[in-house]
């Protein structure tokens, strides 16, 4: 009788250990899957932000010189430069409006990157810091593309300074960005070519 009770208790203990072990394994697998999904989301956000940096840089380098040229030409022709700038702004409106949409997306991508830094600072901290600097520069460039301000001279000085900052931060980002993010950027570029 005692042997039956001992074997019964051992059987129950073995079953309980097996159930607990299975539960722990399932939790570990679930946690690993969630971590992998978060990592994929972080890489995607970093890649999209990088791609959007390039788009915003293109818009700024395309739009700002056109404002300057229209402004300068209006002054040379003794016309109201406000009218000339407004007309140029109107002709570039769809591009400038699209840059506002891109800029809004970048805010969310930067927020996702801040989550990535909290979870994996060794991988994302340097890139996130450079992204924040770039975001500040892009904010100023966006403001100038939406509403050029100052005199022609100060506008040109400001635009040139901002474009130089953009190039500097872009170079820093190119060094800091990891290969998996670069690969994802290439996928985004291919997808957007279609």
PLM segments and residue spans:
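Positively charged n-region of N-terminal signal peptides that target proteins for export
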Residues: 1-4
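Hydrophobic membrane-insertion alpha-helices, especially the h-region
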Residues: 9-21
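Structural signature of transmembrane alpha-helix termini at the membrane-water interface
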Residues: 19-26, 142, 149
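Short, flexible coil/linker elements and helix-boundary hinge sites characteristic
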Residues: 23, 100, 118-120, 170, ...
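Ser/Thr/Pro/Gly-rich low-complexity linker/stalk segments immediately outside membranes or between
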Residues: 25-44
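C-terminal amphipathic alpha-helix
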Residues: 38-93, 130-194
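Mature extracytoplasmic domains of secretory-pathway proteins
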Residues: 96-137
């Amino acid at each position: 009788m005692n042997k039956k009770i001992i074997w019964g208790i051992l059987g129950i203990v073995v079953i309980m250990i097996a159930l607990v072990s299975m539960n722990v394994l399932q939790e570990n697998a679930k946690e690993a899957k969630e971590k992998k999904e978060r990592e994929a989301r972080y890489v995607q956000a970093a890649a999209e932000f990088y791609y959007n940096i390039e788009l915003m840089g293109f818009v700024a380098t395309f739009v700002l010189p056109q404002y300057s040229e229209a402004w300068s030409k209006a002054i040379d022709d003794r016309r109201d430069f406000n009218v000339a700038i407004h007309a140029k702004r109107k002709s570039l409106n769809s591009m400038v409006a699209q840059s506002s949409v891109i800029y809004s997306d970048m805010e969310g991508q930067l927020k996702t990157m801040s989550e990535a830094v909290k979870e994996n600072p060794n991988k994302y901290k340097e890139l996130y810091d450079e992204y924040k600097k770039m975001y500040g520069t892009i904010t100023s460039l966006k403001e100038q593309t939406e509403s050029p301000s100052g005199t022609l001279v100060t506008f040109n000085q400001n635009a040139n300074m901002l474009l130089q900052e953009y190039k500097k931060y872009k170079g820093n980002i190119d060094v800091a960005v990891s290969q998996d993010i670069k690969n994802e950027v290439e996928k985004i570029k291919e997808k957007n070519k279609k």
